């Protein structure tokens, strides 16, 4: 991964943890596997205490990191700890994949 992009991803993760009070921020997808291309987005799985509706959470995170993106597309998915646990118990293959292969930030 390009060192500048890697540094930017780390800063994005730090900001989300600090300002969105995220318990976990996990990089997944092509940037995590090393298969990213110029058309790839930065896939982030976020666990945070929030009462926002599902799609509002993503909008909030995008606004929060707007100045750090520098033109890079970011695709956040935000769940609460309770939602995550429910999906883990249901053996959701998406969640299992993110947790097994994602990179914690």
PLM features per residue range, with description:
Residues 1-24, 33-38, 48-105:
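Catalytic core of pol beta-like nucleotidyltransferases
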Residues 43-47:
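Short beta-strand->loop micro-motif that forms the acidic, two-metal-ion catalytic signature
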